[in-house]
């Protein structure tokens, strides 16, 4: 599918996010079509959100229950990660499953596209996959994350499946995984660690606007795109 109109992207932040997890996808999407293909909105629960590296990011819009009601207005949701493991910012954020941040992720995954001409995509970057796994988004799906967090992601996936009476997903090591559309028609893509978010984002550009557009974007960024290092599923077959 090659789209002719621009898409609205929501990129959500939490305290302790990884800077490249945010900036990598942001720059890819903003450079695609020289900013013509994607309109990117940054959201967080606080006006200023500080990354694990100390960068202060100002939001465009608040993550609250009102924003959850506006999710049909957005075509793509990007969820960055950060340091995972016991006592980490990712663990603390994932533990609060009723927060607006976590609720927004699950609600986006459940909102069907308004039309086939405007697909919906949920893209996790690095350990942002743990948030999706915790909310059951990866039930019965393949997914990936940073290589050091593969076990953490599998645990979150297994725990969510038990809590929601679903079938656990399968975690695999890869630069990115496109597991196809869920039952609501939302495409679920997860990336490996940090810089792999660039590859997943370029893959997203390719999927929506064509390979030439993705190659032009990679050239503009002077980035060697690992375009064949991902896993793309045909239905639920892994190959």
Question: Would you name each region that the model predicts?
Answer:
Residues 2-73:
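N-terminal beta1-alpha1 cap of cysteine-dependent amidohydrolase-like domains
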Residues 2-11, 67-239:
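Active-site-adjacent pocket-lining segments in enzyme domains
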């Amino acid at each position: 599918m090659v789209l002719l109109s621009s898409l609205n992207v929501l990129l959500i932040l939490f305290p302790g996010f990884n800077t490249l997890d945010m900036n990598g996808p942001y720059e890819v999407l903003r450079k695609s079509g020289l900013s013509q293909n994607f309109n990117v909105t940054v959201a967080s629960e606080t006006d200023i959100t500080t990354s694990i590296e100390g960068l202060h990011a100002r939001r465009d819009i608040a993550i609250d229950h009102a924003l959850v009601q506006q999710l049909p207005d957005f075509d793509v949701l990007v969820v960055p990660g950060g340091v995972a493991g016991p006592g980490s910012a990712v663990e603390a954020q994932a533990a609060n499953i009723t927060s607006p941040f976590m609720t927004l992720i699950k609600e986006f995954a459940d909102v069907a596209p308004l039309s086939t001409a405007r697909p919906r995509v949920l893209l996790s970057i690095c350990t942002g996959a743990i948030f999706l796994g915790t909310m059951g988004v990866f039930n019965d799906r393949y997914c990936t994350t940073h290589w050091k967090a593969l076990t953490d992601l599998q645990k979150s996936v297994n725990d969510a499946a038990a809590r929601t009476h679903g079938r656990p997903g399968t975690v695999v090591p890869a630069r990115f995984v496109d597991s196809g559309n869920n039952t609501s028609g939302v495409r679920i893509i997860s990336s490996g660690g940090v810089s792999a978010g660039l590859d997943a984002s370029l893959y997203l550009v390719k999927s929506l606007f064509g390979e030439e557009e993705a190659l032009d974007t990679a050239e503009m960024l002077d980035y060697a795109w690992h375009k064949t290092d991902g896993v793309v599923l045909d239905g639920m077959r892994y190959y």
